[in-house]
Amino acid sequence: KVEPAIRYAEVLLIYAEALNELTSGQVYHLTTYTGADVEIQRSVDEMRYAIKRIRMRAGVPDYSEETYNNPNDFRVKLKRERQIELLGENSMRYFDLRRWKDAMTEENQLLQGCNINISDDETRIADFYKQTIITSVHKVFEQKMYLWPFPTYELKRNVNMTQNPEW
């Protein structure tokens, strides 16, 4: 099966996130790969343009004006939007949590799911959908896991290279 390298929804989410992280009121001057000069700044209209395309397609309402105007509120909403929109796609959540430095909190939470060991008794079907703590899966995330270790053979090939902390 051929899978796209990147979906348009992801491009829009990346764009909105990048705009949100810019300092409000400050104009940045950049040079494109063609040599053209462009100005970029945190723009609520541009952020709304990107997010609205995704939310309209899903049939859910746009965010409030207050959300767009508050970078912290928008960041929280955007993280949730990425979690939902990119569910199950190329380990996106894995890398997002590390990029945002949220993995320590998110990945050390107890795993919850449905009770798959419930009996076939029809009177207990509703119990299947009750959230259950999965005790058989032990999740551990440590600070050192934000960076991967370099393979030993790479360290031997380059004596100037040092291993990442705690590895």
Report residues per predicted region.
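Acidic/polar-rich alpha-helix caps and helix-coil junctions
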Residues: K1-W167
